[in-house]
Swiss-Prot record:
This is Elongation factor P-like protein. CDD domains: S1_EF-P_repeat_1, S1_EF-P_repeat_2. The lineage of its organism: Bacteria, Pseudomonadati, Pseudomonadota, Gammaproteobacteria, Enterobacterales. Belongs to the elongation factor P family. Pfam families: EFP, EFP_N, Elong-fact-P_C. InterPro entries: Elong-fact-P_C, NA-bd_OB-fold, Rib_uL2_dom2, Transl_elong_fac_P/YeiP, Transl_elong_KOW-like, Transl_elong_p-like_YeiP, Transl_elong_P/YeiP_cen, Transl_elong_P/YeiP_CS.
Length: 190
């Protein structure tokens, strides 16, 4: 089993009976002699979606779990269920609207590339989205002529219903790139 200092973002740990996906790691090196380096890890509970934060010493042994990652494409909606199809063997994976409520805010109508499902022991756990997505602004205050890139921000409603802060110079109808995890504007889409 690996030590805490060998854990990387995206790995899955079995900790206190919970499956936790590593979302972020902060390394804190104490200045006192003989003190151990601390690893503050932020997780997402695979089953509940709740955020969890834990601290480990560098030489603490942790239990990792290997999940199966499968590339999927969005297929169709059946009432309250969203069906995704495996890209290789066409296995359907079904999520309820409640299970992927957060992910739906970033998913354009026809789906998006690079989506994956995570499974463990044949059990469907999580729909994982890529880091960024391009979405269209459907509603925002009109763009201000002469507004610079470093100007103030304004709220914008995107095609999926998500509301984020964007620079003042953007207007409705423009496609922008969003960082999914941080829910922030990154720039205009290519």
């Amino acid at each position: 089993m690996p030590r805490a200092n060998e854990i990387k973002k995206g790995m899955v740990l079995n900790y206190n009976g919970k499956l936790l996906i590593v979302k972020d790691i902060d390394i804190q090196s104490p200045t006192a002699r003989g003190a151990a380096t601390l690893y503050k890890m932020r997780f997402s509970d695979v089953r509940t979606g709740l955020k969890v934060e834990e601290r480990f010493k560098g030489d603490d042994i942790v239990d990792t779990v290997t999940l199966s990652r499968r590339g999927v494409d969005f297929s169709y909606v059946d009432g309250n269920e969203y069906v995704f199809m495996d890209k290789e063997d066409y296995t359907p994976y079904t999520f309820t609207k409640d299970q992927i409520e957060e992910e739906l805010l970033f998913m354009p109508e026809g789906g998006m590339p690079d989506m994956q499902v995570l499974t463990w022991d044949g059990q469907l756990l999580v729909l994982e989205l890529p880091q960024t997505v391009d979405l269209e602004i459907v509603e925002t205050a009109p763009g201000i002529k002469g507004a610079s890139a470093s100007a103030r921000n304004k709220p914008a409603t995107l095609s999926t219903g998500l509301v984020i802060q964007v620079p003042e110079y953007l207007s409705a109808g423009e496609k922008i790139r969003i960082h999914i995890e941080e829910r922030r504007y990154m720039g205009r889409a290519d």
